[in-house]
């Protein structure tokens, strides 16, 4: 990291212009000045009357190391010789009211372990990365036409040691990575790792945006974890919260005694539901702080994506009784995405947005927000409401399972079965399923079958892969002892087979963002709650037929229209005995009957399993293997900064 002397920086560059390297100026940097080694401290506090650096080195006496104000807009700086790495410090700020408050450094790259709140001098340089092969491979692929399976996890509660203590970043590399590789997830998505004071905020209420939380080790330890993920072909996505922050006294809130990082207007400053305050996204210094932060994580931690939290809260002012768009936030998000994709055109920028805001994943030059993925919250809500309904009443809400296909290609979507749906009394995915013990497992297998065959990339929260019975308990680890029970082992085996089938089946991901990748066979059988559809790849023979039965009834010799192939194999049946099912499976090879049905050229007669999904693959084409018009399917993408698609 090249440290810039703030006295040489034109004030306009930080206060009025785009300045995305602000971490090179601000914070605590180990430097040599006038042949003396020490630390230069620089901070922005526009309304402070006076500033000091305090720590053990001066017995926390704010009279000793007074900072100099170097711009009228409130940049303060001081070089202190003979201070070394690991020194703890804070800023003592004299407010306009005459009070002295003590604040952690907004740009600190390391902090004390909670409950302590001081910043720590740390030289973030020096980690030797070994992920060039990962970077080369990533550039050769188009994420839009690849399989994507994301394992969402909370670092502190995935697994704990026997004595209840937390695994470190390095220890988690040894524990987590083999597990992720075994399950063939392509990415992990980690709930926020920025420094935060309260464990139960899960990291979403941060105080140190540049500091990887010290709960699990040093910044270099986290770099090692990411490096190891890349070594084994796993991408790393971080939850990132640029919309709001916590009100703890040592953090960003009222940083110099006045609203500094937050809006001044109380009507839009406060988030009463979360007890947080909103970043003032119309302020250039705040934008530079946040966009520099995004690039900092990309450059120094080599992460592969952000899941941007609470975008809906950013897009609209939270004034009671009003729904007015926040143009500051809209402009900020576009600027953020342009900066990110200029840095790395293969990066993942995912919006967690529950609104109907248009063009979230369209490039900014087309009027979009510039993300390249968006969580499909509508799909998640509809599907889970449908699954929680008693099977005999599902026919009355049939449209909840078909509505998503009306808008599935309006954005680049990720289908999230996330942490938000298995906490706060919402029950685990398994326990959402109605019926008896067997029914619950059968329906969860069915849900996963539908999940992996529906258009869109995939995200699953930890524990879902083996059927966690209890909802997520953030102060405990997962119920790993459930592997001692047969039905959970069956579920785990099924999930691994399903994700393996997904990854090796191009029709399930190659045209995720093109309408040509999906065709209903029968979307209207509400009486039996059976859905059938085709997933299609680039080539005609790359096709799968999917049949889902959302009741407990079994149907024999059930006619399903299919494309004109000669034979079909059943490549997966969720009711197979090896997955804990009743064994209502189909013989391996099914001959297609050359009589039209369901607007298809042929049909097969199959057994429809109870609460089951059957996936069929064509064995042999009757004529050719190319699309009739010889064209190549176009897939929607977002390359915000490149001026092309």
From Swiss-Prot:
Cited InterPro entries: A-amylase/branching_C, Branching_enzy, GlgB, GlgB_N_E_set_prok, Glyco_hydro_13_cat_dom, Glyco_hydro_13_N, Glyco_hydro_b, Glycoside_hydrolase_SF
Active site: residue positions: 309, 352
Sequence segments annotated as region (Disordered): 619-645
Reaction(s) this enzyme catalyzes, per UniProt: Transfers a segment of a (1->4)-alpha-D-glucan chain to a primary hydroxy group in a similar glucan chain
Superkingdom to which the source organism belongs: Bacteria
UniProt xrefs under CDD domains: AmyAc_Glg_BE, E_set_GBE_prok_N
Keyword list, A-Z: Carbohydrate metabolism, Glycogen biosynthesis, Glycogen metabolism, Glycosyltransferase, Transferase
Pathway participation: Glycan biosynthesis; glycogen biosynthesis
Listed EC numbers: 2.4.1.18
Gene3D superfamilies cross-referenced by the UniProt entry: Glycosidases, Golgi alpha-mannosidase II, Immunoglobulins
Transferase in keyword set: yes
Enzyme class: transferase
An individual GO BP term: glycogen biosynthetic process
Transmembrane segments: none
One cellular component term from this protein's GO annotations in UniProt: cytosol
Composition bias, Polar residues: 636-645
Function: Catalyzes the formation of the alpha-1,6-glucosidic linkages in glycogen by scission of a 1,4-alpha-linked oligosaccharide from growing alpha-1,4-glucan chains and the subsequent attachment of the oligosaccharide to the alpha-1,6 position.
Protein name: 1,4-alpha-glucan branching enzyme GlgB
Organism: Bacillus cereus (strain AH187)
């Amino acid at each position: 990291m090249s440290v810039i002397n703030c006295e040489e920086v034109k004030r306009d560059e930080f206060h009025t212009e785009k300045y995305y390297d602000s971490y090179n100026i601000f914070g605590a940097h180990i430097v040599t000045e006038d042949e003396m080694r020490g630390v230069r401290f620089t901070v922005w506090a526009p309304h402070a009357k006076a500033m000091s650096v305090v720590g053990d080195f001066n017995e926390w006496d704010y009279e000793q190391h007074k900072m100099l104000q170097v711009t009228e807009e409130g940049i303060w700086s001081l070089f202190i010789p003979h201070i070394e790495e690991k020194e703890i410090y804070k800023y003592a700020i004299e407010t306009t009211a005459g009070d002295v408050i003590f604040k952690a450094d907004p740009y600190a790259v390391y902090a004390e372990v909670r409950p302590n709140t001081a910043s720590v001098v740390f030289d973030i340089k020096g980690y030797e990365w070994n992920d060039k092969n990962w970077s080369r491979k990533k550039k050769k692929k188009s994420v839009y036409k690849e399989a994507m399976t994301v394992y969402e996890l909370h670092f502190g509660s995935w697994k704990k040691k026997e004595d209840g203590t937390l695994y470190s970043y390095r220890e988690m590399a040894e524990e987590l990575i083999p597990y992720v590789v075994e399950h063939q997830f392509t990415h992990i998505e980690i709930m926020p790792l920025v420094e935060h004071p309260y464990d139960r905020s899960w990291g979403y209420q941060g105080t140190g945006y540049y500091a990887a939380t010290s709960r699990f080790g040093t910044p270099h330890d986290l770099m090692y974890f990411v490096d190891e993920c890349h070594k084994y072909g796993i991408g790393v996505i971080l939850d990132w919260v640029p919309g709001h922050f916590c009100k703890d006294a040592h953090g960003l809130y009222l940083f110099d005694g006045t609203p500094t990082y937050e809006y001044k207007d109380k009507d839009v400053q406060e988030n009463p539901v979360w007890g947080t305050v909103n970043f003032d996204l119309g302020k250039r210094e705040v934008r530079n702080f946040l966009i520099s932060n995004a690039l900092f994580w990309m450059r120094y931690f080599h992460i592969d994506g952000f899941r941007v939290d609470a975008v809906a809260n950013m897009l609209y002012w939270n004034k009671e009784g009003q729904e007015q768009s926040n143009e500051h936030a809209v402009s900020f998000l576009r600027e953020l995405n342009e900066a990110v994709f200029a840095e790395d055109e293969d990066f993942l920028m995912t919006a967690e947005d529950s609104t109907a805001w248009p063009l979230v994943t369209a490039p900014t030059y087309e009027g979009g927000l510039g993300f390249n993925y968006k969580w499909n919250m509508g799909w998640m809500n509809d599907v889970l409401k449908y699954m929680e309904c008693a099977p005999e009443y599902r026919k009355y809400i049939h449209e909840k399972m078909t509505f998503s296909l009306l808008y599935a290609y309006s954005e680049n979507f990720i289908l999230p079965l996330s942490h938000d749906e298995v906490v706060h009394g919402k029950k685990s995915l398994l326990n959402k399923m109605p019926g008896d013990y067997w029914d619950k497992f059968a329906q969860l297998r069915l849900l996963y079958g539908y999940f992996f065959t529906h258009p869109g990339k995939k995200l699953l929260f930890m524990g879902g892969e083996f059927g966690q019975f209890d909802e997520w308990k953030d102060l405990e680890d997962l119920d790993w002892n459930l592997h001692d029970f047969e039905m959970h082992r069956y579920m785990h085996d099924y999930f691994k087979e399903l994700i393996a089938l997904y990854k090796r089946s191009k029709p399930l991901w190659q045209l995720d963002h093109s309408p040509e990748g999906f065709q209903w066979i029968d979307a209207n059988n509400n009486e039996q709650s059976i859905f059938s559809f085709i997933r299609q790849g680039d080539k005609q023979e790359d096709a799968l037929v999917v049949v889902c039965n959302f009741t407990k009834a079994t149907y024999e010799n059930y006619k399903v229209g299919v494309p004109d192939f000669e034979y079909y194999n059943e490549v997966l049946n969720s009711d197979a005995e090896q997955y804990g099912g009743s064994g209502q499976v189909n013989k391996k090879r099914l001959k297609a009957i050359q009589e039209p049905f369901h607007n298809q050229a042929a049909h097969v007669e199959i057994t429809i399993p109870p609460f089951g999904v059957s996936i069929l693959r064509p064995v042999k084409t009757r004529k050719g293997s190319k699309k009739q018009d010889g064209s190549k399917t176009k897939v929607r993408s977002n390359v915000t900064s490149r001026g092309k698609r």
